[in-house]
Curated annotation (Swiss-Prot):
<comment type="function">
    <text>Catalyzes the hydrolysis of GTP bound to the 40S ribosomal initiation complex (40S.mRNA.Met-tRNA[F].eIF-2.GTP) with the subsequent joining of a 60S ribosomal subunit resulting in the release of eIF-2 and the guanine nucleotide. The subsequent joining of a 60S ribosomal subunit results in the formation of a functional 80S initiation complex (80S.mRNA.Met-tRNA[F]).</text>
</comment>
<feature type="compositionally biased region" description="Low complexity">
    <location>
        <begin position="409"/>
        <end position="425"/>
    </location>
</feature>
<dbReference type="GO" id="GO:0003743">
    <property type="term" value="F:translation initiation factor activity"/>
</dbReference>
<dbReference type="InterPro" id="IPR016189">
    <property type="entry name" value="Transl_init_fac_IF2/IF5_N"/>
</dbReference>
<keyword id="KW-0396">Initiation factor</keyword>
<feature type="compositionally biased region" description="Acidic residues">
    <location>
        <begin position="426"/>
        <end position="436"/>
    </location>
</feature>
<feature type="region of interest" description="Disordered">
    <location>
        <begin position="396"/>
        <end position="436"/>
    </location>
</feature>
<dbReference type="GO" id="GO:0005092">
    <property type="term" value="F:GDP-dissociation inhibitor activity"/>
</dbReference>
<dbReference type="InterPro" id="IPR016190">
    <property type="entry name" value="Transl_init_fac_IF2/IF5_Zn-bd"/>
</dbReference>
<dbReference type="GO" id="GO:0006412">
    <property type="term" value="P:translation"/>
</dbReference>
<dbReference type="Pfam" id="PF01873">
    <property type="entry name" value="eIF-5_eIF-2B"/>
</dbReference>
<comment type="similarity">
    <text>Belongs to the eIF-2-beta/eIF-5 family.</text>
</comment>
<dbReference type="InterPro" id="IPR016024">
    <property type="entry name" value="ARM-type_fold"/>
</dbReference>
<dbReference type="GO" id="GO:0001732">
    <property type="term" value="P:formation of cytoplasmic translation initiation complex"/>
</dbReference>
<dbReference type="GO" id="GO:0071074">
    <property type="term" value="F:eukaryotic initiation factor eIF2 binding"/>
</dbReference>
<dbReference type="InterPro" id="IPR045196">
    <property type="entry name" value="IF2/IF5"/>
</dbReference>
<feature type="compositionally biased region" description="Acidic residues">
    <location>
        <begin position="184"/>
        <end position="195"/>
    </location>
</feature>
Length: 436
């Protein structure tokens, strides 16, 4: 069934049509997802890359999205009704497809000087796209391709040109023509074409017009790319300031791996000196850019910490409690996340048996967190001092003394009970003898 692209138009003979959105729910539990089976056809009708409307769904629904262009699978995490998605698609069409003047869906998008321009091929109107929407940021990082007719470029230049020359020439021609058709004289400077480099290479501005295909790669490939990016940033010491740290987060967001990036952070920036060099405190701001108010990211970070402890077992296994306490003290991991981690050992990052060892060594801290949660009012001001260079902290010593006192009390009670029983038996024997 075909629908009008602009569903506000009720005319059955409206020339601009698109397929009705078809959605299929797959999986169950935490893995439930909605696959939009005909997103490629819809995107073709709208003349937009299929990842744009898919990403728009994610922005509006607050859900993660996945693209597999090779197999034409466009996924929105969670269970979503097709009619609801169709209504949300209308919002995308209104904001990113329809012309603001003639309301026809014959617009083209151009990313130019940190701005997104829309040019209508029907009426010639040119206007800016709202940059406040989250999708605008995605479009800036993943600009649409320009379809180049190389034969026209050659005819215009009067000679054969390289592919790069032709692409630059046609793109410049499109931008130049959009100036002539625009009613807004203030945009003239912004739309002035940049000169084509004589060596045939695309300029930096034209390079951004190539669609970023990294999102079409598998998650494993993207994780490898992000891991390499983190290693290079560490090697070049680009993480000491806010700008460098933000660059790492932006790259993770570009590859749609912000939560799982925490796992890589632990492996790249933490090692056997995590306690002695106070590495968690040192990289606190960087870690918080990924884990703040995000319990999934915190769980991935704890998985990475497990791997670091496993890699340096001799040095770190006995200091597991210190590491967990440091994560808590620096607000990198929340109390609930740490307690939940300690209650259920996982085999996802290290073997289950080794995960249990880490949790056992961290038990004093986990017990303290549970007690603090139960007795918040009484123990809100309690502080626990952990020294990285001290083998046994004051806190651990207190926990052991407490356990020893409880054992002594139990032993004393048992001794007193046995003495009372013996005394009762003697009394009974005395009474029997007196009776005789």
């Amino acid at each position: 069934m075909a629908l009008n692209v602009n569903r506000a138009v009720a005319d059955p003979f409206y020339r601009y049509k698109m397929p009705k959105l078809s959605a299929k729910v797959e999986g169950k539990g935490n893995g439930i997802k909605t696959v939009i089976s005909n997103m490629s056809e819809i995107a073709k009708a709208l003349e937009r890359p299929p990842m744009y409307p898919t990403k728009y769904f994610g922005c509006e629904l607050g859900a993660q999205t996945n693209f597999d262009a090779k197999n034409e699978r466009y996924i929105v995490n969670g269970e979503h009704d097709a009619n609801k998605l169709q209504d949300i698609l209308d919002g995308f069409i209104k904001k990113f497809v329809l012309c603001k003047s003639c309301e026809n869906p014959e617009t083209q998008l151009f990313v130019r000087k940190n701005n997104i321009k829309s040019k209508c091929k029907a009426c010639g109107c040119s206007f800016d796209i709202d940059l406040k929407h989250k999708l605008s940021t995605f479009i800036m990082k993943n600009p649409p391709k320009i379809d180049v007719d190389f034969s026209k470029a050659e005819q215009k230049n009067g000679k054969k040109t390289s592919g790069a020359d032709a692409a630059a020439a046609v793109a410049a021609d499109i931008i130049h023509n959009s100036d002539k058709g625009s009613s807004n004289d203030d945009d003239d400077d912004d739309w002035e074409p940049e000169p084509v480099e004589p060596n045939g290479m695309l300029s930096a501005g034209m390079g951004k017009l190539v669609l970023d295909k990294d999102l079409e790669k598998s998650e494993e490939q993207r994780l490898d790319m992000l891991h390499t990016f983190f290693l290079k940033a560490k090697e070049e010491d680009r993480i000491s300031d806010a700008k460098g740290q933000t660059a790492l987060r932006d790259e993770a967001e570009r590859l749609e791996l912000k939560q799982k990036a925490s796992l890589l952070l632990a492996n790249v920036f933490l090692d056997e000196k995590v306690i002695t060099d106070k590495q968690i405190s040192k990289h606190r701001n960087l870690l918080l850019r990924f884990t703040l108010n995000d319990k999934k990211a915190q769980r991935y970070l704890l998985g990475g910490v497990e791997q670091v402890i496993h890699k340096h077992e001799a040095e770190l296994l006995s200091k597991s409690a210190h590491i967990i306490k440091s994560l808590y003290d620096e607000d990198v991991c929340e109390e609930d996340s740490l307690i939940s981690w300690g209650e259920k050992p996982s085999s996802k990052y290290v073997s289950k048996s080794f995960a249990k060892k880490i949790i056992e060594n961290s038990q004093p801290v986990l017990n303290w967190l549970k007690e603090a949660e139960e007795e918040t009012e009484e123990e809100s001001d309690d502080e626990i001092a952990f020294g990285g260079d001290v083998k046994e902290s004051e806190f651990l010593r207190q926990q052991k003394e407490k356990a020893a006192r409880e054992a002594q009390q139990k032993s004393a009670k048992a001794t007193n009970g046995n003495a009372a029983a013996a005394s009762g038996a003697n009394d009974e024997e005395d009474l029997d003898i007196d009776d005789i």
